[in-house]
């Protein structure tokens, strides 16, 4: 069971290989990239405890030596001090420009390690081995790397494409139900932004996906990655179409900031709630029928996911403060906030023509329900 999606960027093309049993075969996939048989792996402590020795064995089968650094798990690792620690460790390992760094973990590790690779010796190659559903379908593909700032999420970073992505769906079996469903928020996003047929497939197959059906998981990852690859090829540095991939993120990032990037709200949970709010805003503006946000929420609820602000534990700031947090989003251009809205399921578009009063009303209604 192996699917390959080619991200066909001029001069920087790479494969995303999706399947079962890729970790034990990692050496065979990575070896053709190496000038000498060694790699530096950066992971987090949770993934290290579960999968690091399997990766070491998979690399050793092809004679590849591995050194490893395990950072604390969690969003707080996506910040300056862990970045400095990672770069310092890579320099201590004497990683050369011709070597390969491996990002082995979820979205936090992929973003951090990709950024470290981008700035180390002005750019070394790296391989993504994503271990969460969110990372497999989204953050490991497309070359966005970076860290968070006190002022907002993903505000410091670089575009740096990986040389290879290995998405082994077997490792998804070690995720908690909450982490798996957080990643599913990004999967649903793809159907909502541009593929109604995929969303309908998810409505039918989502429960099997969550229950561990390998065929369904492979298909969901493949379709998500293919859609992202197609968009990235058209617009690598987010000058146009790539912004569609931020459906749900303008609201979601503000909610993450409001909860202090803590365990109260995982990134994918914020995206799922953000998608529901984006469709609510679209309906309020008369762009789509009220049936669209209702159907989005119905599917998320059926999957046991967070769908509304009342699903977030603890207090939240008021609507005006949330709107101000949205203004820190990296999608602001000339002081104007860009929204990804929709004319219906699978029909998203980018616009800055949104009245602040409409956004405030949607947020106030959502907070009232809390």
Curated annotation (Swiss-Prot):
GO biological process, one term: aromatic amino acid family biosynthetic process
Annotated compartments: Cytoplasm
Keywords annotated in UniProt: Amino-acid biosynthesis, Aromatic amino acid biosynthesis, Cobalt, Cytoplasm, Lyase, Metal-binding, NAD, Nucleotide-binding, Zinc
UniProt-listed Enzyme Commission number(s): 4.2.3.4
GO molecular function terms listed in the Swiss-Prot or TrEMBL record: 3-dehydroquinate synthase activity; metal ion binding; nucleotide binding
Residues involved in Zn(2+) binding: 186, 249, 267
Chain positions recorded as NAD(+) binding sites: 107-111, 131-132, 144, 153
Cofactor binding: number and manner: Binds 1 divalent metal cation per subunit. Can use either Co(2+) or Zn(2+).
A Pfam family that the UniProt record links to this protein: DHQS_C
InterPro entries in the cross-refs: Dehydroquinate_synthase (IPR050071), DHQ_synth_AroB (IPR016037), DHQ_synth_fam (IPR030963), DHQS/DOIS_N (IPR030960), DHQS_C (IPR056179)
Pathway annotation: Metabolic intermediate biosynthesis; chorismate biosynthesis; chorismate from D-erythrose 4-phosphate and phosphoenolpyruvate: step 2/7
Group of enzyme by EC: lyase
Keyword flag DNA damage: no
Cofactor(s) listed: Co(2+); Zn(2+); NAD(+)
Annotated catalysed reactions: 7-phospho-2-dehydro-3-deoxy-D-arabino-heptonate = 3-dehydroquinate + phosphate
Cellular component GO terms held in the UniProt record: cytoplasm
Family stated for the protein in its record: Belongs to the sugar phosphate cyclases superfamily. Dehydroquinate synthase family.
HAMAP family cross-referenced by the UniProt entry: DHQ_synthase (MF_00110)
Function, in words: Catalyzes the conversion of 3-deoxy-D-arabino-heptulosonate 7-phosphate (DAHP) to dehydroquinate (DHQ).
Name this polypeptide is given: 3-dehydroquinate synthase
Organism: Roseobacter denitrificans (strain ATCC 33942 / OCh 114)
Organism ancestry: Bacteria, Pseudomonadati, Pseudomonadota, Alphaproteobacteria, Rhodobacterales
Gene behind this protein: aroB
């Amino acid at each position: 069971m192996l699917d390959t999606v080619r991200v066909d960027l001029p001069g920087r093309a790479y494969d995303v290989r999706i399947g079962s049993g890729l970790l034990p075969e990692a050496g065979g996939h990575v070896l053709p990239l190496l000038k000498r048989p060694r790699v530096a792996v950066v992971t987090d402590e949770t993934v290290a405890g579960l999968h690091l020795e399997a990766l070491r064995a998979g690399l050793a089968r092809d004679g590849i030596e591995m050194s490893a650094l395990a950072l604390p798990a969690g969003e707080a690792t996506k910040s300056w001090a862990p970045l400095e620690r990672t770069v310092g460790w890579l320099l201590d390992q004497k990683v050369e420009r011709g070597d390969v760094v491996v990002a082995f973990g979820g979205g936090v590790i992929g973003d951090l390690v990709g950024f470290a690779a981008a700035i180390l010796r002005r750019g070394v190659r790296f391989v993504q081995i994503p271990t969460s559903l969110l990372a497999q379908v989204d953050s490991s593909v497309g070359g966005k790397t970076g860290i968070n700032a006190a002022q907002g999420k993903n505000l410091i970073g670089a575009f740096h494409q990986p040389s290879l992505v290995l998405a082994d769906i077997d490792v998804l079996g070690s995720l908690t139900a909450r982490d798996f469903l957080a990643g599913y928020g990004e999967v649903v996003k793809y159907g909502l932004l541009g593929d109604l047929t995929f969303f309908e497939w998810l409505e039918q197959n989502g429960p099997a996906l969550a229950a561990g059906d390998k065929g369904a998981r492979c298909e969901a990852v493949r379709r998500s990655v293919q859609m992202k690859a197609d968009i990235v090829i058209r617009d690598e540095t987010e000058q146009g179409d790539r912004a569609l991939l931020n459906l749900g993120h303008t609201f979601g990032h503000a909610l993450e900031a409001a909860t202090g990037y803590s365990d109260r709200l995982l990134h994918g949970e914020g995206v799922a709630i953000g998608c529901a709010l984006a469709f609510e805003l679209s309906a309020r503006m008369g762009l789509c029928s009220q049936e669209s946000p209702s159907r989005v929420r119905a599917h998320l609820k059926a999957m046991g996911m967070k769908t509304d602000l009342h699903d977030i534990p603890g207090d939240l700031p008021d609507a005006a403060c949330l709107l101000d947090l949205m203004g820190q989003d990296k999608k602001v251009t000339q002081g104007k906030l860009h929204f990804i809205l929709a004319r219906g399921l699978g029909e998203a578009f980018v616009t800055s023509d949104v009245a602040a009063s409409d956004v405030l009303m949607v947020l106030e209604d959502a907070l009232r329900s809390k």
